[in-house]
């Protein structure tokens, strides 16, 4: 997906593993379940990365860590700017050795619509990613009975707002 931290010009994906069996299964699944040419041992799909995508991603991969560092810098600027603002909760980052890469910078606010309108008036784009929780989707109707047991999920879905996040975002923006 082009908007991801390591996005090509279309859809594509990557699986990394140190499990040889899992790697073999993934290779089969991406090629219609083939174990060898014309021998399909499982149901799969056509999920091979084409050479154009591979070439683009090959150029972008060496720059990924620098790009993620720029995203982290922008996130820290957001953190500082949003600190102490009532009704705004910034993303929480683990205090251990893990490092957030900020594909999105999603805040929570009980005044989402007002804030989104304010940002729009200032020419600042924002987005609401995943506004309908999975247990509220028709495809997962069997989960509907558990809806009353997911108040945090429902509340969060009504409060999330994604602020602009990309490596080239400047402090002035």
For the regions a protein language model found, what residue spans apply to each?
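Short, well-ordered alpha-helical segments in soluble proteins
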Residues: 4, 13, 30-33
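Active-site phosphate-binding strand-loop segment of PLP-dependent enzymes
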Residues: 2-8, 16, 162, 166
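Conserved active-site segment immediately N-terminal to the catalytic lysine
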Residues: 1-9, 36-41
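Adenylate-forming
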Residues: 8-12, 57
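PLP-dependent aminotransferase class I/II
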Residues: 18-173
């Amino acid at each position: 997906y082009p908007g991801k931290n390591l996005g090509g010009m279309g859809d594509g994906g990557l699986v990394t593993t140190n499990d040889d069996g899992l790697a073999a299964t993934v290779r089969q699944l991406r090629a219609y379940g083939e174990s060898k040419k014309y021998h399909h041992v499982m149901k799969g799909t056509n999920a091979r990365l084409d050479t154009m995508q591979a070439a683009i991603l090959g150029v972008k991969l060496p720059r990924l860590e620098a790009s993620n560092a720029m995203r982290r810098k922008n996130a820290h600027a957001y953190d500082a700017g949003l600190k102490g603002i009532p009704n705004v909760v910034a993303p929480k980052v683990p205090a251990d050795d893990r490092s957030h890469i900020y594909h999105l910078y999603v805040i929570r606010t009980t005044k989402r619509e007002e804030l989104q309108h304010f940002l729009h008036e200032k020419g600042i784009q924002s987005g609401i990613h995943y506004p309908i929780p999975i247990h509220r989707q028709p495809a997962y109707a069997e989960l509907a009975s558990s809806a009353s047991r997911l108040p945090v999920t429902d509340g969060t879905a009504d409060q999330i707002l994604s602020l602009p996040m990309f490596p080239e975002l400047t402090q002035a923006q």
